[in-house]
């Protein structure tokens, strides 16, 4: 299995813009893997929002995956057979599903909910001061 971070770094190398919203700073093993891909440091746009629990990937507003899996070895099926999580998800090109996902992602990205969020003290990327 090709590491997810390697795929992201290769896409960035091809000029693909990638935005990532995550709920907390990743643990040490992930950070060590992340450090292997200098392009990610320079070009991956990311925002930390402690309220985010959704998992979705939107590609050019035309395709989307959404489901329960975290982007971890256990969530993505990279662990040994007996250590994988039971997950589900949907891959779609249906605009009626993609549009609300895109709207939700963009809303969080812009910080639309930051003023009323009770966790701003944990959010270093909140655009509202």
Where are these regions (language model features)?
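PLD/PLD-like phosphodiesterase catalytic module centered on the HKD motif
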Residues: 1-129
């Amino acid at each position: 299995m090709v590491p997810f971070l390697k795929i992201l770094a290769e896409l960035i190398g091809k000029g693909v813009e990638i935005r990532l919203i995550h709920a907390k700073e990743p643990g040490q093993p992930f950070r060590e893997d992340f450090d292997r891909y200098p392009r990610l440091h320079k070009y991956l746009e990311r925002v930390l929002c402690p309220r985010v629990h959704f998992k979705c990937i939107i590609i050019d507003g035309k395709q989307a995956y959404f489901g329960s899996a975290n982007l971890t070895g256990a969530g993505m099926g990279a662990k040994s057979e007996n250590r994988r999580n039971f997950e589900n998800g949907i891959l779609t090109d249906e605009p009626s599903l993609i549009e609300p996902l895109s709207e939700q992602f963009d809303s969080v990205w812009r910080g639309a909910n930051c003023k009323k969020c009770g966790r701003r003290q944990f959010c270093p990327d909140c655009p509202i001061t």
